[in-house]
Swiss-Prot record:
Gene3D superfamilies: YcgL domain (3.10.510.20). It comes from the Bacteria. Residues 1-85 form the YcgL domain. It holds the Pfam family YcgL. This is YcgL domain-containing protein AHA_2135.
Length: 93
């Protein structure tokens, strides 16, 4: 399965996968508005045996077939303060 991958100019590390290049017809307007003007990053052939990074290839393929797009957002930032507090608490016990 071929797909086009676009990055957002508004949201860092946010990518939109669509079935065909320049075809955003199945992407909701509100999402396109929040995403901003898409910038093509690459055209790729999805292969379940090859990892994509954050998202699983099979999940991306399933979303493309069912809804016509897949939105990849960055993982939430680490809360270093909470980690530090938990470590201090564990050391005291």
């Amino acid at each position: 399965m071929l797909c086009a991958v676009y990055k957002s100019r508004k949201k860092a590390e946010t990518y939109l996968f669509v079935e065909r290049r320049e075809d955003f017809s199945r992407v909701p307007e509100v999402l396109m508005s929040a995403f901003g003007r898409p910038e093509l990053v690459l055209m790729t052939k999805l292969d379940p045996a090859k990892p994509l990074g954050i998202a699983s290839t099979s999940r991306v393929m399933e979303a493309l077939q069912s809804q016509g797009f897949y939105l990849q957002v960055p993982p939430p930032p680490e809360n270093l303060l909470e980690q530090h507090k938990a470590q201090l608490k564990a050391e005291r016990e």
